[in-house]
Amino acid sequence: MMQKQNMIVVNQKEIAKNIYELVLQGTLVQQMNEPGQFVHIKVAEGIAPLLRRPISICNVDQEKNEFTMLYRAEGQGTKTLATRKQGEMVDVLGPLGHGFPVEEAEAGQTALLVGGGIGVPPLYELSQRLVAKGVRVIHILGFQTKDVVFYEEKFAELGDTYVATVDGTHGTKGFVTDVIDHYGIDFDILYSCGPLAMLRALEGRYKEKKAYISLEERMGCGIGACFACVCHLQEDPSGHSYKKVCSDGPVFPIGEVVL
């Protein structure tokens, strides 16, 4: 159930170039039960910047009432958020959206989790949930260069983990699909989050597989009211049918929406 709460900053640190790990605490965490959901953060007091920032939920610890989110500090809003210190309060709205269907993976099956850039974080909580129910996980994490690689070791604790960098400075040179081809990776179910180009490449390969993708879109309200994040359905060539990424997604079955 969505709630709005002022949450306390437990810790914040830069874990890669311009990539920050922020841990917040509050009872709102008890509502975070679906990996792949996101929160809307009010990054500063006052009206500037006006819009909240959507940030995915990376890790949930309900015993401590803490959750972790990772984000890239690149615009005015996220750069402001990066200045928040331990003990300060952050206005959080969430959890929002529909996450990854963990129930679609069965114990003993192999799940392939593919993340690109800042699309990697929500896969961490998902991976933990899958491992807990006896699913074998394989991770492929794609980044531009080694300076922005993060959470490789954390994912490796859960299952086989491969990294691809576009410039070849870490792991396999190229894209996540190059890793799949090089190692001949097979799987029963696919979960993915990242840039559209990556999602399109995966859709082109695995449209007949059981697969789910999370779309990264710039969202305004986060609750389906402003229509800033609509995407059209593939089954309707007229373009009149659509779904809203923030409320109907951000996770969709592969092949359902136009990428």
Swiss-Prot record:
Residue numbers binding FAD: 53-56, 70-72, 77-78
Cofactor note: Binds 1 [2Fe-2S] cluster per subunit. Binds 1 FAD per subunit.
Domain FAD-binding FR-type: 2-102
Gene Ontology biological-process annotations: 'de novo' UMP biosynthetic process
GO molecular function: 2 iron, 2 sulfur cluster binding; electron transfer activity; flavin adenine dinucleotide binding; metal ion binding; oxidoreductase activity
Superkingdom of the organism of origin: Bacteria
InterPro entries hit by this protein: Cyt_c3_hydrogenase_gsu, Dihydroorotate_DH_ele_sf, Dihydroorotate_DH_Fe-S-bd, Dihydroorotate_DHASE_ETsu, FAD-bd_FR_type, FNR_nucleotide-bd, OxRdtase_FAD/NAD-bd, PyrK_electron_transfer
Keywords: 2Fe-2S, Electron transport, FAD, Flavoprotein, Iron, Iron-sulfur, Metal-binding, Pyrimidine biosynthesis, Transport
Protease is among the record's keywords: no
Pathway connected to this protein: Pyrimidine metabolism; UMP biosynthesis via de novo pathway; orotate from (S)-dihydroorotate (NAD(+) route): step 1/1
Residues reported to bind [2Fe-2S] cluster: 221, 226, 229, 246
Signal peptide (from-to): none
Cofactor(s) it depends on: [2Fe-2S] cluster; FAD
Family under the similarity heading: Belongs to the PyrK family.
Assembly and oligomerization: Heterotetramer of 2 PyrK and 2 PyrD type B subunits.
Function: Responsible for channeling the electrons from the oxidation of dihydroorotate from the FMN redox center in the PyrD type B subunit to the ultimate electron acceptor NAD(+).
Annotated protein name in UniProt: Dihydroorotate dehydrogenase B (NAD(+)), electron transfer subunit
Organism of this sequence: Bacillus anthracis
